[in-house]
């Protein structure tokens, strides 16, 4: 069983994907840098949670296509 993400993490991740279509990939390390660039997240812990959720959403999107 995995961890449950807060609604803030989910909302911000979805907003980033919507506003920057095609930029995020399935690579977590690259997504970390992009989250730092496109958002105002102040802590490393929160940045990593958002980048991880973005990576998961991108992977799910690719498998559905």
From Swiss-Prot:
One of its GO terms (biological process) is translation. The keyword Signal does not apply. PROSITE patterns: RIBOSOMAL_S17E. One of its GO terms (molecular function) is structural constituent of ribosome. Pfam families: Ribosomal_S17e (PF00833). GO terms for cellular component: cytosol; ribonucleoprotein complex; ribosome. Keywords: Ribonucleoprotein, Ribosomal protein. Belongs to the eukaryotic ribosomal protein eS17 family. NCBIfam families: PRK01151.1 (NF002242). This is Small ribosomal subunit protein eS17. It comes from Methanobrevibacter smithii (strain ATCC 35061 / DSM 861 / OCM 144 / PS). The lineage of its organism: Archaea, Methanobacteriati, Methanobacteriota, Methanomada group, Methanobacteria.
């Amino acid at each position: 069983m995995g961890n449950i993400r807060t609604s803030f993490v989910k909302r911000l991740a979805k907003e980033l994907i919507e506003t920057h279509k095609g930029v995020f990939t399935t690579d977590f390390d690259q997504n970390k840098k992009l989250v730092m660039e496109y958002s105002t997240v102040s802590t490393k812990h929160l940045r990593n949670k958002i980048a991880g959720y973005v990576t998961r959403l991108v992977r799910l999107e690719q498998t559905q296509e």
